[in-house]
């Protein structure tokens, strides 16, 4: 035996490893003429037959994951035991019953899973897998349905939004155009009015000039010409024209009678005021000095003081109305002439 070789008995390896695991042999190998690692070691010593090597390779390729539950291991063993030709699809009755159960409740409880498996003649794991796949398909369809519904709502809202934007633009354009037209209408009449007024101020028309000329002429004529029915104030010699003297030898006073009834209904003038003042002055002068001579001859009113004067009701009313309306002011010359007339009347009486 070559001292550079190590030979292990395969029987010892089988006894040490009941599962049939093989041990590595260090030393020479192969044939005596070969230069391999196991040079000079026959193949029978290695204890590796082809049948065991093939079965061990198949077992090594189907290694189980580390984190697995007991139920999963049992289910895997169940599926591994069934050959591909032995696996069968679900029948229509089983699918209908599973669908009805899923519609009632999409969550699968352990008791319910066991009951369904017993009634359908299926494995509990197979029922759980079917429910899991059906729930995934239901979620996908639900998402698709929600997506279609939301997309339709979005499209409707987008169409309404575009319609509102177009209406807004159209209404805004109308408002702008109407505002411009309104501003033009408000600006044009005001400018035309201002221009016309300026032209009228700068260039008065013929009617305005004629009216102004006529008005000035009328005012001048009214100031220059006496009013209608105006009479010149009587002269001092004519003051006693309507009166008479009574020389009956009894020392009676002469009576001056003023006839103011004539023209009482006409416009009151300065002469009416003058005669009224003269009558009042005469009444004051003759009061208490002379006695009434003849009531029949005079035909006038008799006062308590013995002075006779003729003032009819119409003249009295005219004098009262004239006093209420206001007396036309005379100038200084007319006042002096009236005073002189009153003194002359008193003197002749």
Swiss-Prot record:
Signal peptide interval: none
Membrane-spanning parts: none
Gene3D superfamilies: Homeodomain-like
Compositional bias ranges of the Low complexity kind: 188-198
Keywords (A to Z) from UniProt: Activator, DNA-binding, Homeobox, Nucleus, Transcription, Transcription regulation
UniProt subunit comment: Homodimer. May form a heterodimer with HOX4.
Region called Disordered, residue ranges: 181-253
Localization annotation: Nucleus
Database matches in InterPro entries: HD (IPR001356), HDZip_class_I_plant (IPR045224), Homeobox_CS (IPR017970), Homeodomain-like_sf (IPR009057), HTH_motif (IPR000047), Leu_zip_homeo (IPR003106)
A Gene Ontology molecular function term of the record: sequence-specific DNA binding
Entry comment describing in which tissues the protein is expressed: Expressed in seedlings, roots, leaves, nodes, internodes, flowers and embryo.
Function statement: Probable transcription activator that binds to the DNA sequence 5'-CAAT[AT]ATTG-3'.
DNA-binding segment(s): 83-142
GO CC annotations, alphabetized: nucleus
Protein name from the UniProt record: Homeobox-leucine zipper protein HOX5
Pfam families documented for this protein: HALZ, Homeodomain
Biological process annotations from GO: positive regulation of DNA-templated transcription
UniProt record similarity statement: Belongs to the HD-ZIP homeobox family. Class I subfamily.
Superkingdom of source: Eukaryota
Keyword Glycoprotein: no
Stretches for region Leucine-zipper: 141-185
């Amino acid at each position: 035996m070559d001292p550079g070789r190590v030979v292990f008995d395969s029987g010892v390896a089988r006894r040490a490893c009941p599962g049939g695991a093989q041990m590595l042999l260090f030393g020479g190998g192969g044939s005596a003429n070969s230069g391999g690692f196991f040079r000079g070691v026959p193949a029978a010593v290695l204890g590796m037959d082809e049948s065991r090597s093939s079965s061990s390779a198949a077992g090594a390729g189907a290694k189980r994951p580390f984190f697995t539950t007991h139920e999963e291991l049992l289910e895997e063993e169940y599926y591994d035991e069934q050959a591909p030709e032995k696996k069968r699809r679900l029948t229509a009755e089983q699918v209908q019953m599973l669908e009805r159960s899923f519609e009632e409740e999409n969550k699968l409880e352990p008791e319910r899973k066991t009951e369904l498996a017993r009634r359908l003649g299926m494995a509990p794991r197979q029922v759980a897998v079917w429910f899991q796949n059906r729930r995934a398909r239901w979620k996908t369809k639900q998402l698709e349905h929600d997506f279609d519904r939301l997309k339709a709502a979005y499209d409707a809202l987008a169409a309404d939004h575009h319609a509102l934007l177009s209406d807004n633009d159209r209404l805004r354009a109308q408002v702008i155009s109407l505002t411009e037209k309104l501003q033009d209408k408000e600006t044009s009449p005001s400018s035309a009015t201002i221009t016309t007024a300026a032209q009228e101020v700068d260039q008065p028309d013929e009617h305005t000039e004629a009216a102004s000329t006529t008005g000035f002429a009328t005012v001048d004529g009214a100031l220059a010409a006496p009013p209608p029915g105006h009479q010149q104030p009587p002269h001092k010699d004519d003051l006693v024209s309507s009166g008479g003297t009574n020389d009956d030898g009894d020392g009676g006073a002469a009576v001056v009678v003023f006839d103011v009834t004539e023209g009482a209904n006409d416009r009151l003038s300065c002469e009416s005021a003058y005669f009224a003042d003269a009558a009042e002055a005469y009444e004051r002068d003759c009061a208490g000095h002379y006695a009434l001579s003849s009531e029949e001859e005079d035909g006038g009113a008799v006062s308590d003081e013995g002075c006779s004067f003729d003032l009819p009701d119409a003249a009295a009313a005219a004098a009262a109305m004239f006093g209420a309306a206001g007396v036309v002011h005379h100038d200084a010359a007319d006042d002096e002439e009236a005073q002189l007339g009153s003194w002359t009347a008193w003197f002749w009486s």
